[in-house]
Amino acid sequence: GHPIAHDRWPALRDRLAACRSIALYDIDGFAEGFAEIHNIADLPIGGVYVQDIARIGTRVLGHKAQPVTDLASSDADIVLVATFDSDRAASHIAHLLPEGAEMANLDEIRLPDEMLTNRRRYLDPINFATNFAFFRDADGHHTRLVTANYWAGYGAEGVALWCRLFG
């Protein structure tokens, strides 16, 4: 995950951890990949719900995937829609929420819009044109980074470089 998204995760995680039971709606199949990046093993996930009928009955995060239409009969006090750009998915299941349940989604941890090229489709590959550089600063050796603004060649304006150093 991106370091900024990682920095936003604790607030959502705390909100989920405070719940009695979470219904996880894995509409796009992101839940297991997300769980590999963010530790969710100790969250009170009461059930996993899917829309794709081919996934019903499969194991997702140790739970037998149930059809999203069964969501209303869960005892969850929060439904986590495990996707980005979740407005449409959330509106499609709003009538299925258990009584009194609130909804959460991964949009709560997304990068700020000013860092995105395509703000309408968060997971568009253009938003994550990422390069990694490993720097050395020891024993008289140093790394120098030189770059070029190739985005201008594609018509981009106001291009910025964002870096985060880890020590």
Spans of features found by a protein language model:
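Extended intrinsically disordered, low-complexity coil regions enriched in Ser, Thr, Gly, Ala
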Residues: 147-167
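Contiguous beta-strand segments within globular domains
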Residues: 139-144
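Hydrophobic, well-ordered beta-alpha structural blocks that scaffold small-molecule cofactor pockets
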Residues: 1-131, 135-137, 148
